[in-house]
């Protein structure tokens, strides 16, 4: 019995030694060799983020109206673009990017207006530039701005008026 027990121990030792030897050889083969060549992979990501402007204003106003008229604009983008750290912009066509309400046939009849903005938006240069921007987040992807026309001050004549606004997005 003693010899059988010793043989088992010897076989176990031989087996363990062989496994140990093989595993050291396998690990040696898995070591990273020195650098012999280098290649750089390049990826260009383009700004394909959509941006939309939604506006609302009263459809009709009488000449005799003295009630202030509010024009609202909302700029939004997608959630993925917000995750990427996008910044949405809104600006008008007037001097210093102000909003211009202009009569479509009587071009002398126009008013340059300073927009009001929501609390999380900013003017590009407060007091001198009416371009508005907002760093959007997944929770808040909307820039809101508005202008008020006071018919007591900005007298409106019959006809159609227009206001052109632009929106953009960058990072």
From Swiss-Prot:
GO terms for biological process: adhesion of symbiont to host cell surface via host glycoprotein. Gene3D superfamilies: 2.60.40.2910. It comes from Escherichia coli. The gene is aggA. GO terms for cellular component: pilus. The keyword Ribosomal protein does not apply. It comes from the Bacteria. Residues 1-28 form the signal peptide. It is found in: Fimbrium. This is AAF/I fimbrial subunit. Its main location: other. Keywords: Fimbrium, Plasmid, Signal.
């Amino acid at each position: 019995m003693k010899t059988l027990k010793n043989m088992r121990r010897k076989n176990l030792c031989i087996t363990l030694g062989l496994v140990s030897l093989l595993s050291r050889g396998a690990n040696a083969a898995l070591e990273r060799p020195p650098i012999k060549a280098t290649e750089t992979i390049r990826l260009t990501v383009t700004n394909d983020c959509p941006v939309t402007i939604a506006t609302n204003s009263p459809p009709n106003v009488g000449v005799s109206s003295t009630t202030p008229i509010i024009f609202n604009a909302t700029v939004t983008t997608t959630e993925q673009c917000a995750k990427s750290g996008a910044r949405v912009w809104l600006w008008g066509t007037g001097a210093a990017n102000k909003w211009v309400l202009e009569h479509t046939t009587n071009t002398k009849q126009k008013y340059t207006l300073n927009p009001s903005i929501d609390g999380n938006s900013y003017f590009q240069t407060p007091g001198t530039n009416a371009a508005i921007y907002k760093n959007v987040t997944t929770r808040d992807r909307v820039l809101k701005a508005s202008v008020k026309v006071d018919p007591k001050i900005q007298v409106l004549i019959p006809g159609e008026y227009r206001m052109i606004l632009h929106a953009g997005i960058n990072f």
